[in-house]
Swiss-Prot record:
A GO cellular-component term linked to this record: brush border membrane
Gene: SLC20A2
Name of the protein: Sodium-dependent phosphate transporter 2
Region (Disordered): 275-311, 459-478
Family per similarity comment: Belongs to the inorganic phosphate transporter (PiT) (TC 2.A.20) family.
GO MF annotation, one: phosphate transmembrane transporter activity
Pfam families the record matches: PHO4
Positions of disulphide bridges: none
Topological domains, Cytoplasmic: 27-46, 108-109, 164-190, 235-483, 553-572, 611-622
Predominant location: membrane
Length: 653
């Protein structure tokens, strides 16, 4: 059958297929490296580099099997024997419908399934072309069933693996020995699965025709050799690396403690750059003691009629402002004294130049080293009412172990910090404006953590009528120790690469499956598509996926790697290994499961095991709803394009 007149459709198909591959990379890339980026074991740039290598390799070696299912397993192509151009138009419509919806979802940061998109789009154009008889509904039922089976199976496998790791490694007093013993097993399992997948699924591409027992034997042998290599070389190197890291941290902590204990009470390097302040009588008052100042200067030193307040290790003025010699802005330093005797300072700066400097004020010293009367300082937060940084500075302990020196305070001192009555490890303060922090900054609790300091009014904490969380009942989120982080850091990189390899093999079919059908129809002039999937088309799809990853992949990575549940290297390793194992098995049997479903199932299962409160169930609900929406929406887009081609273009060409 002469179809040379439809070359324009093939060219259009190649362009749309690349856009479709781009959308697959932008959305589904989070399935392979989202958890690795979320746990911090790799940066976004490193993830893009590794994913580019393994996505492309996986697409070339594993993509042919699933691509055949996408091309011929959803609709009966024999019904198009007399209308080849209609099937070609349908393949173009399927790619357009899938690409449009995935690009919209990526823009909305919504992780959806590329498999869902292409299946829905294929059904959509078939309904327009020849009605319901063109759809193999039993195959569709199997595919829909796999959408539920894949997250459940992947979640179950991830959960079991994480429980075993937690029992035998994470919960041990010293997790390193058991972790090092398990390394060869983990690496061997990963290598065995990959080798088996390449030799079994990619055998036609590689020109290998081997029985299954031979493939299994070769895979086991390669895995055994790799396990010996890990045991002899990687484990000793990892042991030295962990020991060196722990020794370095201990040495730095010891040196820091010794250095801080030698700092003079009147000497504060933090303020050496700051000039003197102007008091109300225009007399110059230094913000900190200088080298020439007598070391015996007391905290109660006064200058003129203006008392000098203690400022951590430095002595500072409670009123005035000064022009900074190292910036173009004004460094305001205003004092507010309340009836409780505490001095509150507002620091204004119209640029972020002093952010780090002021951050050091409160962190220069631990509470166990300062007298009970000395001040402690808070982290800076962006003031919502001003384009400057506002810091509330007052005498306030950050740890519950730091007790007030005068336990027999007068009743009016209850206006001060709640002290012993609260835990400083949980509650935090929040202030949003200049006036609110001035009025309430002392009546709060504080916690310094990786995300900064939030603030909550102490009036809420001390009010007996207010409900309060019971720390004993609150489930604590498990966090990896330093040695566990190092141990699983390397493992998660490997499993992320494994996941990327599996993702490329499974999802490249979503991008170039219709393109392969379009090309084979044009080349052979028939709809049966008997030829093997060309390797160069698989590579073309892999390049498109990598392009989408580099340009737009970070949007959905945020959702999968951080928003759904916090990820640590140990949990990330479990998620990656179990979900990738599920995907590879499905790819080998030719079942187009969704890598999104597998990864989401693993993330939720492991997050729920770590802590039920660690999972964002609202986000999970939205993702679950999106799984159902994707098929009909992609089908509608595809049906619209198919109607346009059939009734608006094909009759006139």
């Amino acid at each position: 059958m002469a179809i040379d007149g439809y070359l324009w459709m093939v060219i259009l198909g190649f362009i749309i297929a690349f856009i479709l591959a781009f959308s697959v990379g932008a959305n589904d890339v989070a399935n392979s490296f989202g958890t690795a980026v979320g746990s911090g074991v790799v940066t976004l740039r490193q993830a893009c580099i590794l994913a580019s290598i393994f996505e492309t390799t996986g697409s070339v070696l594993l993509g042919a099997k699933v691509g055949e299912t996408i091309r011929k397993g959803i609709i009966d192509v024999n019904l198009y024997n007399e209308t080849v151009e209609t099937l070609m138009a349908g393949e173009v419509s399927a790619m357009v419908g899938s690409a449009v919806w995935q690009l919209i979802a990526s823009f909305l940061r919504l992780p959806i399934s590329g498999t869902h998109c292409i299946v829905g789009s294929t059904i959509g154009f078939s309904l327009v072309a020849i009605g319901t008889q063109g759809v193999q509904w039993m195959e569709l039922v199997k595919i829909v069933a796999s959408w539920f089976i894949s997250p459940l199976l992947s979640g179950f496998m991830s959960g079991v693996l994480f429980i075993l790791i937690r029992i035998f490694i994470l919960k041990k007093e010293d997790p390193v020995p058991n972790g090092l013993r398990a390394l060869p097993v983990f690496y061997a399992a990963t290598i065995a699965i990959n080798v088996f997948s390449i030799m079994y699924t990619g055998a036609p591409v590689l020109g290998l025709v081997l029985p299954i027992w031979a493939i299994a034997l070769i895979s086991f042998g390669v895995a055994l050799l790799f396990a010996l290599f890990v045991w002899l070389f990687v484990c000793p190197w990892m042991r030295r690396k962990i020991a060196g890291k722990l020794q370095k941290e201990a040495a730095l902590s010891r040196v820091s403690d010794e250095s801080l204990s030698k700092i003079q009470e009147v000497e504060s390097p933090v303020f050496k750059e700051l000039p003197g302040a102007k008091a109300n009588d225009d007399s110059t008052v230094p913000l900190t003691g200088s080298a020439g100042e007598p070391s015996g200067t007391s905290e109660g030193t006064s200058v003129g009629n203006h008392p000098r307040a203690s400022y951590g290790r430095a002595l500072s003025m409670t009123h005035g402002s000064a022009k900074s010699p190292v910036s173009n802005g004004t460094f305001g330093f205003d004092g507010h004294t309340r009836s409780d005797g505490h001095v509150y300072h507002t620091v204004h700066k119209d640029s972020g130049l002093y952010k780090d400097l002021l951050h050091r004020i409160h962190s220069d010293r631990g509470p166990e080293e300062r007298p009970a009367q000395e001040n402690n300082y808070r982290f800076l937060r962006r003031n919502n009412s001003y384009t400057c940084y506002t810091a509330a500075i007052c005498g306030m302990p950050v740890h519950s172990t730091f007790k007030a020196a005068d336990s027999s305070s007068a009743p009016e001192d209850s206006e001060k910090l709640v002290g012993d009555a609260v835990s400083y490890s949980k509650k935090r303060l929040r202030y949003d404006s200049y006036s609110s922090y001035c009025n309430a900054v002392a009546e709060a609790e504080i916690e310094a953590d990786e995300g900064g300091v939030e603030m909550k009014l102490a009036s809420e904490l001390t009010d007996p009528d207010q409900p309060r969380d019971d720390p004993a009942e609150e489930e604590k989120e498990e966090k990896d120790t330093a040695e566990v982080h190092l141990l699983f850091h390397f493992l998660q990189v490997l499993t992320a690469c494994f996941g990327s390899f599996a993702h490329g093999g499974n999802d490249v079919s979503n991008a170039i499956g219709p393109l392969v059908a379009l090309w084979l129809i044009y080349e052979q002039g028939a709809v049966l598509q008997e030829a093997v999937t060309p390797v160069w088309l698989l590579f073309y799809g892999g390049v498109g996926i990598c392009t989408g990853l580099w340009v737009w992949g970070r949007r959905v990575i945020q959702t999968m790697g951080k928003d759904l549940t916090p990820i640590t290297p140990s949990s990330g390793f479990t998620i990656e290994l179990a979900s990738a194992f599920t995907v590879v098995i499905a790819s080998n049997v030719g079942l187009p499961v969704s890598t999104t479903h597998c990864k989401v199932g693993s993330v939720v299962a492991v997050g729920w095991i770590r802590s039920r409160k660690a999972v964002d169930w609202r986000l999970f609900r939205n993702i679950f709803v999106a799984w159902f929406v994707t098929v009909p929406v992609a089908g509608l887009f595809s049906a619209a394009i198919m109607a346009l081609l059939m009734y608006g273009i094909l009759p006139y060409v």
